[in-house]
Amino acid sequence: MKVILRKDVKNLGMVGDIVEVKPGYGRNYLIPQGLAEVATEGAVKNWQLGAERRAKKIEAELKAAQAAASKLKDIVLTFTKSVNTEGVVFGSVNKADIYKALKELGHEIEKENIELNMPVKKLGETDVNIYFKPTVSAVIKVKIEPVVVEAK
């Protein structure tokens, strides 16, 4: 099944791309979510008519994404967590924690753009990817430090 992508879809393509997908993926996910439409002759012609306008919009979005990515490139988010005597962290740092910390610093991102397969559960620094567009991403560092408890 051929579809025209209305929005960027990770691992599939960018806005305006005509891609071949399995029929179930197209009918059950891409089209209902508004991410794509069936690539009929009429739809392709309509899409091509608005291509110049969309190209300018895409270029502006790409520049904004690159600017946002450049602002994030040197960021280190530091979290303090309790640890036991062996240095094992109680709890973890997940997408929601990273999202909240970036929001507090004034960065506008979507939680879905944070690529974190598993919560961070170890002391030290971990690299986390933030994707703005399929071709634009930034790497931030997430650092977990132990809570300092003063002896009595």
Curated annotation (Swiss-Prot):
Family annotation (InterPro entries): Ribosomal_bL9, Ribosomal_bL9/RNase_H1_N, Ribosomal_bL9_bac/chp, Ribosomal_bL9_C, Ribosomal_bL9_C_sf, Ribosomal_bL9_N, Ribosomal_bL9_N_sf
GO terms for biological process, alphabetical: translation
Pfam families: Ribosomal_L9_C, Ribosomal_L9_N
SUPFAM superfamilies, sorted: L9 N-domain-like, Ribosomal protein L9 C-domain
Record key words, sorted: Ribonucleoprotein, Ribosomal protein, RNA-binding, rRNA-binding
Entry GO terms, CC: ribonucleoprotein complex; ribosome
A molecular-function term among this protein's GO annotations: structural constituent of ribosome
Sequence similarity: Belongs to the bacterial ribosomal protein bL9 family.
PANTHER family from the UniProt entry: 50S RIBOSOMAL PROTEIN L9
Function: Binds to the 23S rRNA.
Protein name: Large ribosomal subunit protein bL9
Biological source species: Elusimicrobium minutum (strain Pei191)
